[in-house]
A protein has these predicted regions:
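Outer-membrane beta-barrel translocator/receptor signature
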Residues: 241-244, 253-336, 342-348, 396, ...
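Acidic, small-polar-rich N-terminal luminal/periplasmic segments of exported/outer-membrane proteins
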Residues: 72, 86-89, 132-280, 629
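Structural signature of Gram-negative outer-membrane beta-barrels, strongest in the C-terminal barrel
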Residues: 341, 450, 469-481, 523-649, ...
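Conserved C-terminal beta-signal and adjacent last beta-strands/turns
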Residues: 595, 627, 714-820
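Acidic/polar loop-and-plug regions of large Gram-negative outer-membrane beta-barrel proteins
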Residues: 320-324, 337-405, 418-450, 495-521, ...
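Gram-negative outer-membrane beta-barrel transporters
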Residues: 541-542, 646-648, 666-752, 817-819
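Membrane-embedded beta-barrel scaffold of Gram-negative outer-membrane proteins
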Residues: 401-417, 421-427, 594, 620-683, ...
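Surface-exposed extracellular loop regions of Gram-negative outer-membrane beta-barrel proteins
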Residues: 359-371, 480-484, 580, 584-628, ...
Length: 820
């Protein structure tokens, strides 16, 4: 008989349970066989391991820690009901972990014999206390901070609020783990976020970057946070080899994270958590192949060392290259990521350094439909770009973070980092005028350099005022950025004839106009973003009612210069206050109702550098507002969420008037997105894991110039998005699993006038994996096929720039991972 480890421990009210009551619902360790390796007293082990236990009642946190570390523990719930814990983040031995959690609480860990322990008040010698035989299951999975199956984490980092349990925050949050990344062979951040029905991906403007839409609003890759800091990650494409967790926050987040550098992310934000050295040494080598001839490898090494394993190092090296599944397209990528950390009794320090380089030759271009109809997509493998087109993206970045426990209730933190970006490339977008594919090929050469610095500092703590608990957060943040750009291009009249369905190669065009010096790009933008935030989460009725209130004061200083002339095109210095209100009600152990009212604030958008009448024009800051309500369900092994929301934000679009060849980019009116979301994740049945969801969205434009587009739907926003992803363990074949995923996305308008649109599409993916042990090494074989039917479809329309991105063709991915 097999007993599943308990994954959730509810908090109990002292009014319902007497002194000798069991502190938590638990499974007896004696019910299941215990390997001999675990028979020794785990408290005597000097090995350290990483923990990510969210803040909560001290009893709950102790129970989770004991279960993960394998310590049979008994204690009296009534003694701990009034004590709050900040949780446990980082690497600890079992002894140092208990010492950290119990420090200042007035309680000690006592042996009960036979490797069992209890928690009792500090008493004089000779005093005694009667305890019943309560235990915490010491055989609990090390992944207790995830739902069953390990695909989704129970906690996430939420900006100034810190690491929080998802069910205890009044927002819609999901966090995908490194296990999800590995099993799906997700090479980029876009591959990971595709698991959520609220997110879809498109190509960026011209240079093959990844752009996401969350709740129907864009998120640029350079507006993604790294351990809570903006401006440090690679600007266009983020690879996943060094990623431990991807935290997705849905909705405006000006209070949570502050203003994003480029002004996107109103519909949601993403935070990347890097890998750290674990208590068990990491020795992993992966070799992989993807169609057509892309091969690569990934080496992941981690080790803790020093006294009590206080020092840690994690190194990830990866390289891939070859032809993709798109005809004549080749890609090469390199990654070096080094993470170092130190964990003392009170002080924790971590550093992260990375270098990433991406090279794309003849990457399939975006398509601009500039006629009265939208052409049907060509074959899924077709490439209509020019053989002289290419893009190279190179990023070097680093970050240092430190935390110090001032006492048992307050922790101070500080962090800072910097990044240098160098981008270059020649691009050949296609402008299609009719359903026969009649087109013209454009040309753009655009080097771009960028330097960012980012810093954060704050104080987190907790205290009680009578029966009310408080979780206080104070934070300061700042980001300083400088952008340098230049370009060479051809006039509209000089674009060369071509065809979407029968593309021809043309010589590289002669430049007809340019901006700045391509060998020494001039400064085109500077931004300085500073903010201060304070919040308090008040807990009532044994923390079953949680009220979050907060405010962030933000200052945006932006300067911009025209790339061609060098003339100043923007100069503003504005300060804006953004509040947040949130409520969580937990009437039952497995149910949380939540509601929030939160705002978004973003640096105003910048018009594209070409193909508009106002290139590089910078607009003032935009404020958006969201109201949201929903319910979260947690059944230990799996969870589900249901929510409704309304987002109001100023709308930006490129308007093309009849008879004009170039449109004008402007902030024109207001866009309202109303949506309904449903998600389920975890393992509802033994051996069956789900990542499923559905999103329904209604958008409407209002207050537009002269009412020209009032009542229309916003461009690039589907009416619905469905996801169904499953993994099934094959009975009788240990370590083997099959997987499948269906993605369904509704039709979208391409322009604000709603005269051009693309239809709905469906994509099916299949996969399998098999893990086994050979010669004391664990080997995992994986195979995935994306877009099994090789369906040709327009995957997305830009939300602002009127271009289309075609979906990827059928792609086979296989890999072999050896843990040694």
């Amino acid at each position: 008989m097999t007993f599943r480890p308990l994954q959730h421990v509810p908090r109990m009210s002292p009014t319902r349970f007497p002194l000798k009551a069991l502190s938590l619902a638990i499974a007896l360790t004696g019910l299941a066989p215990v390997p001999s390796a675990l028979a020794a007293d785990p408290l005597q082990s000097s090995a350290a391991r990483s923990y990510a236990i969210a803040p909560g009642p001290l009893g709950d946190v102790l129970a989770q820690f004991a279960a993960i570390s394998g310590v049979p523990l008994s204690f009296d719930s009534k003694l701990l009901n009034d004590h709050h814990s900040d949780g446990l983040q980082g690497s600890y031995t079992v002894q140092s972990g208990f010492a950290h959690l119990l420090q200042g609480s007035g309680y000690s860990l006592l042996s009960t014999g036979e490797n069992g322990y209890t928690v009792a008040p500090d008493v004089k010698v000779g005093d005694a206390m009667e305890l019943s035989a309560t235990t915490v299951n010491g055989d609990m999975s090390a992944q207790s901070d995830t739902y069953a199956g390990g695909q989704v984490a129970r906690s996430a980092r939420l900006g100034v609020l810190g690491n929080r349990d998802i069910k205890d925050v009044p927002f819609s949050v999901v966090s995908y783990t490194s296990k999800t990344i590995a099993d799906q062979q997700a090479r980029t951040l876009g591959d990971v976020l595709l698991n959520d029905a609220s997110v879809r991906q498109s190509a960026g403007f011209g240079n093959f970057s990844q752009v996401f839409t969350i709740r129907g609003l864009p998120l640029q890759t350079d507006d993604i946070a790294f351990n809570g800091l903006y401006g440090l990650l690679p600007r266009q494409i983020i690879t996943t080899e060094a990623v431990e967790r991807v935290d997705l926050f849905k909705g405006p987040n000006a209070f949570i994270n502050g203003v994003s550098p480029q002004g996107s992310g109103i519909g949601g934000s993403v935070n990347i958590v890097p890998k750290r050295a674990d208590d068990t040494p990491t020795r992993s080598m992966t070799l992989d192949y993807a169609s057509d001839t892309t091969v690569g490898g990934h080496l992941d090494l981690g080790q803790r060392f020093g006294e009590d394993n206080r020092f840690g190092a994690r190194i990830n090296l990866a390289q891939h290259g070859g032809e993709t599944a798109i005809d004549d397209e080749t890609k090469r990528s390199q990654l070096i990521a080094v993470a170092l950390d130190y964990h003392g009794d009170r002080l924790r320090i971590s550093t992260d350094f990375g270098y990433q380089k991406e090279r794309i030759n003849q990457g399939r271009a975006v398509v601009y439909p500039n006629g009265s109809v939208v052409p049907h997509p060509p074959s899924a493998k077709d490439n209509y770009s020019q053989d002289w087109s290419w893009s190279q993206l190179e990023d070097t970045y680093g970050m240092v973070n430190a935390e110090y426990d001032l006492n048992d209730h307050w922790t101070a933190y500080v962090g800072g980092g910097a990044k240098h970006t160098r981008e270059n490339g020649e691009y050949s977008s296609l402008y299609v005028s009719d359903k026969s594919g009649t087109a013209k090929t454009g040309f753009l050469y655009s080097p771009h350099d960028e330097d960012n610095k980012s810093a954060v500092a704050g104080l987190n703590g907790h205290f009680d005022t009578g029966p009310v608990t408080h979780q206080m957060n104070f934070g300061l943040s700042g980001m300083w950025g400088e952008q340098r750009s230049a370009y060479e291009a051809i006039l509209v009249a000089n674009r060369q004839p071509n065809n979407l369905y029968n593309p021809v190669q043309i010589p590289r065009p002669s430049v007809t106009y340019f901006g700045s010096d391509i060998h020494d790009p001039r400064i085109v933008g500077k931004n300085r973003i500073k903010s201060a935030a304070v919040s308090d989460t008040l807990g009532f009725v044994d923390d079953r009612v949680l009220l979050t209130v907060g405010v962030r004061r933000q200052t945006l200083e932006v300067d911009a210069w025209n790339t061609a002339s060098g003339a100043r095109s923007a100069n503003y210095d504005e300060s804006i206050t953004t509040p947040v209100y949130g409520l969580v009600l937990k009437p039952w152990d497995h149910v949380s109702f939540y509601a929030n009212r939160i705002e978004g604030l973003a640096q105003g958008p910048t018009a594209p550098a070409t193909n508009v009448t106002n290139p590089n024009e910078v607009f003032p800051p935009r404020r958006s507002k969201q109201t949201e309500a929903g319910v979260k369900l947690d059944w230990d092994d799996y969870g589900a969420t249901f929510g409704v929301y309304r987002i109001e934000q100023p709308n930006s679009a490129t308007t093309l008037l009849p008879g004009n060849r170039l449109g004008t980019f402007n902030v024109d009116g207001e866009q309202v997105n109303k949506g309904l979301e449903m998600n389920i994740f975890g393992e509802p049945l033994d051996g069956l894991r789900l990542l499923a969801g559905a999103t329904f969205m209604h958008t409407e434009l209002s207050k537009t110039s002269n009412g020209l587009t009032d009542g229309n739907r916003a461009a690039g926003v589907p009416r619905f998005q469905y996801n169904l992803s499953t993994q099934w363990d094959i009975p009788g074949l240990e370590g083997a699993a099959l997987s499948g995923r269906i993605l369904r996305t509704g039709g979208e308008y391409i322009n604000a006038e709603n005269t051009l649109s693309i239809p709905a599409w469906t994509r099916v993916d299949l996969g399998a994996r098999y893990g086994f042990k050979a010669d004391d090494k664990y080997i995992t074989l994986r195979a995935n096929v994306e877009n099994v039917a090789n369906k040709a479809y327009w995957a997305s329309a830009s939300t602002a720039n009127n271009y289309l991105t075609q979906g990827e063709p059928r792609t086979l991915k296989v890999s072999a991972t050896v843990d040694f």
